[in-house]
Every structure is written in structure tokens, then in C-alpha cells.
A protein has these predicted regions:
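Cys-dependent protein tyrosine phosphatase-like superfamily
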Residues: 2-348, 364-674
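Hydrophobic anchor at the beta1->P-loop junction of P-loop NTPases
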Residues: 350-352
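Ser/Thr-glycine-rich phosphate-binding loops at phosphate-binding pockets of nucleotides
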Residues: 354-360
Length: 674
């Protein structure tokens, strides 16, 4: 680091130490509304920017984590004050007007420093305390176990083994310590292959298909240049092919555009030469690099920030950004790999340049298409843990956790999350989780509130002792899993089992703009009630009705049994009664079977002359009600299906429901397309 940069950093730090604790008479502008700006106080804490409105009836608060701040733009001073525009990584946009220029400058300098910490220990997760004890924190990190995930796939087996060749990260410092490799791949072959691969990221297993032995492996690009070759690397690919007895070849998928891969040859890198590798089929996909993706997202967000654009302007801007074309390219790669594994029974090796961006996207999309387990709540967490966190996706560099090179920032995992959402739109019953689940994961990738997405590798996280010092996001999401359930999810084989097969005709798969993600803070663009919440309420009401129907059917069955017993008694010859008694089958009694069967003649009247032996078969109405709680229910149940939202536990007057304080219009939620 240069002395000039250090001096600048020192000045920023000193200014930040003297940051204003609060600034009064600040106005928060709603850029998408004509409403008057809200007047309030702006607070700067060690972790958040907080705006509190002055209105005594609402006192609405807006909280923003410093780690969520992407850019801060100081605009020209006007008669109303100094304008500050804060753009966030979760696509929130705030415009505040500060009366005094000096205060605005102080806030600007402070936020620049607070939004770009220089050490991991300054991040929010190291001070975040959800009031859980040590044992609860440890249990949170144990929620997911990758060794169990590989066992679920059927590993180890005759073809694949768990290798400790990377113990203590001695071969590749961005790989996990435990990796599955073909049994035919010796330590010598693995070491030789690693030396011939960029960043020493040799081919390792990502996903295994138990029923046909096909696999998805991942690596980085080979250091082939124009003519270099490596015997061990060639043997490694042969070992992957032999681990699948059902196929005599493997696909090698390079996710880069061919022109980019060829340009890498000049730097001594490149791609596999089919003349040197036997029994491989090579395929280029054409996903652009991180710089193109960063610029594409920026262009799309500029369109989202337009005030009242015409439909043609919005669509033109969206098309010009190229964002959905990039999403389609990632999806096409995942579809190609899934078809190769499912339909051809062939194994696939996937790589890009270094094997931690496009490779992670493509492997995880393909796995999601192939395996319904990854379309469940816990399965999706495992997928991210396996293909992103464990295999060394550079979270710190890609999402700007610390102050660093802005050219390294790129929305790589954001694109994967959007691919999942696009699939959910096409297969609404195939995913156990809902849109809110995806949005919350995206939010916490940038929030640094939990320790899961820190650092660039497993090695760095262990050196920082992340699990001992922070909390796991997965435990938080699992605890609140009821909020993330998809009400349309069905355990139907046609929807949830096996491979998701997308339409082959391009016109049958429509890629949509995800307003729920990119416009989620623009309240005027969202329905007054979440579609998911509305459907969940309908599902709960339906479940209550089904339970009530089942209870009524059970009651009816019991009453019909009593009716049948009475009929049997009637058919027997009358005997003198040893003891006098009252009729136990009085047609005038309340709650008689006639109320349900509509047949008054089917229940005989009894006289005191009938014997005890026969009367033992008959229950009095009082005994019937006291012996079976289902039969002694309130009269509102006897009439059929009561109003489930207005049942008082005490049986008294209808108590107000939980939703009684909500807007009446919420029952008429407007279903909008995403």
C-alpha cells in the first residue's frame, strides 16, 4: 500500500472519529412519490444510519446498515439545503436533504469511512448479539453438515472416495480440506493436475447422480497456452470418465465466450486441447466476465431509478442493459449440464477462468434442476454452502465487505439467486421456499450481520475463527422457516421429483424483470398485501376447514354406529324389564341422529319394559355427550362449518381476529406479475 493511500486513509479515519452523532431538521425525500419530504433527525451509530421522523403519531424509523451502503453521492447545494444520495447493495435508495453544508460534508465523510471498513473485525457480525448463549451459537453452525450431504448422494462408493490430499490447504488454499475425487485418481495425479490448473484448483466433485453414476465436477482453466500439456491432468479427466461406467466420454464445459478463452491462451492459460484429452466433448457456453455483469447491473438500476418512465423507455432501458440476456446465458449452461447428466448419463467437468464465479453459478443451477432436495428450504442452504461457500467463492472481493478494488465487485451470486426465482416463476409448485426467502438471503450476503458470507475461502474463515465469534444465518432462517414456506409447494412427482425440464422452445420460457427484488423498497410498485401472505392465509383457512370436516365425519360415523345398535335392539323380541327405566332413544331428545341423517324412523322409541341387557347397547344422550368430546362440541359446530376466524376459546362472543386491525383492503390483495 502506498504512503499516499495510507495518509488518505488516516485522514478519513480521523474525520470519522469525530463524526456527528446526529443531525436535526433533515428531510427524507420519497423519490417515487409527490408527497412532501418527511422531516426528522439523522443518527449515525457505529453500525447503522438511522432516520427518525418527527411526526409524533408515527415516529417512523428507517435503518440502514453501513455494510449495505454501495455508493454515497454528494449533490449540488440548493436553497433547501445539501442533497445526499445513498445507494444500497440491497437496491434501497435514499435521498436526504441536510440544511447546513458543513453537516452534510461531515456526514458524507463519515459514511465513506463507515461503509468501507479496512478490517473484518469492524464488520457488524462481530458485534451483533442476538442474545443466544454459546451452545446455541454452536448448534446454529452445526445445522448443515456437508458430509451428510455427500452421504445422501451415495458417497463414498466404488467409484468415488473422500480425499485428504488438501489437508491443511497444502495443495489449494481456496478449496476445502475434504474433497471427493475418483478412486482411480492417486495423490500423484491430483498434485500434477493441480500444478496445471489456474490457482491450483484441480477437478473435484460437485454433484453425483446415484442412479446413473453421472457426475458434475468443477475446476479452473488449464495452463495450456498454445501447446502445453500435462499427463497427470489428462489422467485426472480419464479417471472422472471411468468413474461413470455408463458413458464412454465426458463433457468439458467452458462457461466463457470462446473469444475470451482464446485470449487467455496468450497469457499461458486457455482451455483443453481435444487432441490431448481422449474421449472428451468440448462445449463453450458464453457467459460474460464479472466486469460486463457489473456494468449491466448498473445500467438496469439506472432504469429502475427513472421517475415515471414510459413503458417503451423502461423496456428499451432493460433491453439495453443486457441483464436478462446474461441470466438466460447462465440458465442455458445449467440446462445443458442437467440434460447431459439426466438424458445422456454423461459426466461433466465445468470451469471458467479461476473456477469460483461462473463455475459456481452453473454447477448450482444444474444441481437445482436435477435434484428436488435442493428445492427445499434446507436443501437450498446446503447447495449454497457446498458450491459457493465451501468451494471458495470470493465473497469479500465480489460484494465489497472491506475496502478494496471496486473492479473486483460483481453481482455473481445475485444472478444465481435470480435464476432460482425465474425457475420458481415457471415451476411454482416445485419449490418449498418462496420469494421472500431468496430476498432475505440476498440481503444478508451484503449485511455482514452473520458470518457465513465473510472472507474469500474456508481457510480465511477458519483463521478468523468465524464460527466461534459470529452467528450463522442458516440457523436464523431455519428458526423462522414458517415465513419462507411456499403455499403452492406440492409433494407431487410431476412437480417436485426428478429433473425440472424446461420448455425447449425459447418462446415458452419467458424471462421476467424481478420487481420484487429490484423495486422492493418502492411501495407504490408493490401490492398492498404480499401474494405469498395471502396464499398462506388461504392455505391455513383451507387446512382448518379440512380438519373441521374430518372431525364432523368422525362424529357422523360414531352416531351412525349408535343408530345401527338401536336398530339391532329393535329387531330383538321384547322381554320384561327387571328394572324400570326411561327410554334412552327419545326422538324428541336434542342432538339425535335425525339431526344428521334426516331419517326419524330409523331410531326406535323405547319403553321402560325393555330389559337391561338390551339397554346396555344404547347410550343416553347425556352419556353420549359426556363420553365423547367430539360429540359434545358447541352448537355452532353441529350446524356444519362455523366461522373459523370468530371462535372464542371460551365459547362466548366472537373475539376480534389478529387481522382485525389491518386494512380491510388487504383481503382484496391485487395480484401483480413480478
Amino acid at each position: 500500500m502506498s504512503s499516499q493511500h495510507c495518509a488518505k486513509e488516516k485522514r478519513l479515519f480521523q474525520q470519522c472519529q469525530q463524526r456527528p452523532r446526529k443531525v436535526e431538521n433533515v428531510r427524507l425525500v420519497d423519490r417515487m412519490s409527490s408527497k412532501k419530504a418527511a422531516l426528522g433527525t439523522l443518527y449515525l451509530t457505529a453500525t447503522h444510519v438511522i432516520f427518525v421522523e418527527n411526526a409524533p403519531d408515527t415516529r417512523k424509523e428507517t435503518w440502514i446498515l453501513h455494510s449495505q451502503i454501495s455508493t454515497i453521492e454528494k449533490q449540488a447545494t440548493t436553497a433547501t439545503g445539501c442533497h445526499l444520495l445513498i445507494r444500497c447493495k440491497n437496491f434501497q435508495l435514499l435521498q436526504v436533504i441536510i440544511p447546513q453544508e458543513r453537516d452534510c460534508h461531515d456526514v458524507y465523510i463519515s459514511l465513506l469511512r463507515l461503509a468501507r471498513p479496512v478490517k473484518y473485525e469492524e464488520l457488524y457480525c462481530f458485534s451483533f448479539n442476538p442474545k443466544l448463549d454459546k451452545e446455541e451459537r454452536e448448534q446454529g453452525w452445526l445445522l448443515l453438515d456437508l458430509s451428510e450431504e455427500y452421504k445422501r448422494m451415495g458417497l463414498p462408493n466404488d467409484h468415488w472416495q473422500l480425499s485428504d490430499v488438501n489437508r491443511d490447504y497444502r495443495v489449494c488454499d481456496s478449496y476445502p480440506t475434504e474433497l471427493y475425487v475418483p478412486r482411480a485418481a492417486t495423490a500423484h495425479i491430483i498434485l500434477g493436475s493441480s500444478k496445471f490448473r489456474s490457482r491450483r484448483r484441480f477437478p473435484a466433485l460437485s454433484y453425483y447422480r446415484r442412479d446413473n453414476h453421472a457426475s458434475i465436477c468443477r475446476s479452473s482453466q488449464p495452463l495450456s497456452g498454445f501447446s502445453a500439456r500435462c499427463l497427470e491432468d489428462e489422467q485426472m479427466l480419464q479417471a472422472i470418465r471411468k468413474a461413470n461406467p455408463g458413458s464412454d466420454f465426458i463433457y468439458v464445459v467452458d462457461t466463457r465466450p470462446k473469444l475470451n478463452a482464446m485470449a487467455n491462451r496468450a497469457a499461458g492459460k486457455g482451455y483443453e486441447n481435444e487432441d490431448n484429452y481422449s474421449n472428451i466433448k468440448f462445449q463453450f457456453i458464453g457467459i460474460e466476465n464479472i466486469h460486463v455483469m457489473r456494468n449491466s447491473l448498473q445500467k438496469m438500476l439506472e432504469v429502475c431509478e427513472l421517475k415515471s418512465p414510459s413503458m417503451s423507455d423502461f423496456l428499451w432501458g432493460l433491453e439495453n442493459s443486457g441483464w436478462l440476456r446474461h441470466i438466460k446465458a447462465i440458465m442455458d449452461a445449467g440446462i445443458f449440464i442437467a440434460k447431459a447428466v439426466e438424458e445422456e448419463g454423461a459426466s461433466v467437468l465445468v470451469h471458467c477462468s479461476d473456477g469460483w464465479d461462473r463455475t459456481a453459478q452453473v454447477c448450482s443451477v444444474a444441481s437445482l434442476l436435477l435434484d428436488p432436495h435442493y428445492r427445499t428450504l434446507k436443501g437450498f442452504m446446503v447447495l449454497i454452502e457446498k458450491d459457493w461457500i465451501s468451494f471458495g467463492h470470493k465473497f469479500n472481493h465480489r460484494y465489497g465487505n472491506l475496502d478494496g478494488d471496486p473492479k473486483e465487485i460483481s453481482p455473481v451470486i445475485d444472478q444465481f439467486i435470480e435464476c432460482v426465482w425465474q425457475l420458481m416463476e415457471q415451476f411454482p409448485c416445485a419449490f418449498e421456499f418462496n420469494e421472500r426467502f431468496l430476498i432475505h438471503i440476498q440481503h444478508h450476503i451484503y449485511s455482514c450481520q452473520f458470518g457465513n458470507f465473510l472472507c474469500n475461502s474456508q481457510k480465511e474463515r477458519r483463521e478468523l475463527k468465524i464460527q466461534e465469534r459470529t452467528y450463522s444465518l442458516w440457523a436464523h432462517l431455519w428458526k423462522n422457516r414458517a415465513d419462507y414456506k411456499n403455499p403452492l409447494f406440492r409433494a407431487d412427482p410431476s412437480q417436485t421429483q426428478g429433473t425440472l425440464r424446461l420448455p425447449t422452445a425459447p418462446c415458452n420460457f419467458m424471462y421476467k424483470f424481478w420487481s420484487g427484488m429490484y423495486n422492493r423498497f418502492e411501495k407504490g410498485l408493490q401490492p398492498r398485501q404480499s401474494v405469498t401472505d395471502y396464499l398462506m392465509a388461504v392455505k391455513e383457512e383451507t387446512q382448518q376447514l379440512e380438519e373441521e370436516l374430518e372431525a364432523l365425519e368422525e362424529r357422523l360415523e360414531k352416531i351412525q354406529k349408535v343408530q345401527s345398535n338401536c336398530s339391532e335392539v329393535k329387531s330383538k323380541p321384547s322381554e320384561p324389564s327387571k328394572h324400570s327405566g326411561f327410554s334412552t332413544c327419545n326422538n324428541s331428545a336434542a342432538n339425535t341422529p335425525q339431526d344428521y341423517s334426516g331419517n326419524a324412523r330409523s331410531f326406535p322409541s323405547r319403553t321402560p319394559s325393555q330389559g337391561d341387557e338390551d339397554s346396555a347397547l344404547i347410550l343416553t344422550q347425556d352419556n353420549l355427550k359426556s363420553s365423547d368430546p367430539d360429540l359434545s362440541a358447541n352448537s355452532d359446530q353441529e350446524s356444519g362449518v362455523e366461522d373459523l376466524s370468530c371462535r372464542s376459546p371460551s365459547g362466548g362472543e366472537c373475539a376480534p381476529s389478529e387481522d382485525s386491525g389491518k386494512d380491510r383492503d388487504s383481503d382484496e390483495a391485487v395480484f401483480l406479475t413480478a
